[in-house]
Amino acid sequence: MHTTTILICFFIFLVQVSTMDAHTDKYVRTLCGKTAIRNIANLCPPKPEMKGICSTGEYPSITEYCSMGFSDSQIKFMCCDNQ
């Protein structure tokens, strides 16, 4: 019975530790950064005649994008306002 209690406590500890890391700012920024670039590329597809992804030449900061939570319409205005 004592061994079972220790195993249960250990399992609960592992679950708590794994979920703590899932919600840290660094973890959220990492996930956001990966999806932000794909989302911006989908909203403002690059054109062959342009060197960058954005027609205005101003690529939005990924840090700002993730911390401010820009909407799709804001990204279109900042990045591809002529589309």
UniProtKB/Swiss-Prot annotation:
Location in the cell:
Secreted
Question: Could you say which residues form the signal peptide?
Answer: 1-21
GO CC annotation terms, alphabetical: extracellular region
Query: What keywords is this UniProt entry annotated with?
Result: Disulfide bond, Secreted, Signal
Disulfide bond positions: C32-C66, C44-C79, C54-C80
Q: Which family does it belong to?
A: Belongs to the insulin family.
Q: What is this protein called?
A: Probable insulin-like peptide alpha-type 2
What is the source species? Caenorhabditis elegans
